[in-house]
């Protein structure tokens, strides 16, 4: 347990013994995952960086924080599987949709939807947490697959 409970109603509750079953994989705990420390990010495009948080080759899934400190672009692409996004700060959206995400907004992307991610100029950097399954397929100007 990270710290002892004092007044919480559950303070006398004991942890599960042997909580990691034989088929359990290691968990990940990252303090301050959406940090603005750019040393922890890798270039995703010329204007957007990614902080990988978790990658599972066996499940073909990953989680990351995308960040753009000024106007940014992740060019046309689609995901053959669903994607979940939660906006931490800043402002972003898809050119193909009529919404703009700001801090606290949640987005569910349906499988196979093509889009162009744009980050807007804002007083705070655009930071969004993404959960992705499968590849990201780049598209040309007409929406046809152009690479993985």
What are these regions (language model features)?
Residues 120-148:
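Double-stranded beta-helix
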Residues 67-68, 80-81, 98-107, 144-146:
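"Short basic amphipathic alpha-helical interaction patches in structured regions
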Residues 55, 64-66, 74-79, 96-99, ...:
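Short histidine-centered beta-strand/loop micro-motifs
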Residues 50-52, 63-65, 84, 106-108, ...:
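Conserved hydrophobic/aromatic beta-strand scaffold that supports enzyme active sites
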Residues 1-60, 144-147:
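A short, N-terminal "cap"/entry segment at the start of jelly-roll beta-barrel domains
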Residues 69-71, 79-96:
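Glycine- and acidic-residue-biased ligand/ion/polar-headgroup-sensing regions
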Residues 49, 81-83, 124:
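Residues that flank catalytic or metal-binding motifs in active/ligand-binding sites
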Residues 57, 93-116:
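Short acidic-glycine-tyrosine-enriched beta hairpin
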């Amino acid at each position: 347990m990270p710290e002892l409970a004092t007044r919480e109603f559950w303070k006398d509750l004991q942890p599960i013994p042997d909580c990691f079953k034989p088929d359990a994989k290691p968990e990940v705990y990252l303090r301050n995952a959406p940090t603005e420390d750019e040393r922890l990010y890798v270039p995703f495009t010329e204007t957007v960086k990614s902080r990988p948080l978790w990658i599972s080759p066996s499940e073909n899934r990953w989680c990351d924080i995308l960040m753009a400190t000024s106007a940014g672009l992740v060019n046309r692409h689609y995901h053959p599987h669903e994607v979940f996004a939660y906006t931490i700060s800043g402002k972003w959206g898809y050119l193909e949709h009529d919404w703009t995400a700001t801090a606290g907004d949640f987005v569910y992307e349906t499988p196979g939807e093509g889009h162009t991610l744009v980050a807007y100029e804002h007083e705070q950097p655009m930071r969004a947490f993404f959960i992705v399954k499968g590849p990201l397929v780049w598209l040309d100007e007409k929406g046809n697959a152009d690479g993985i």
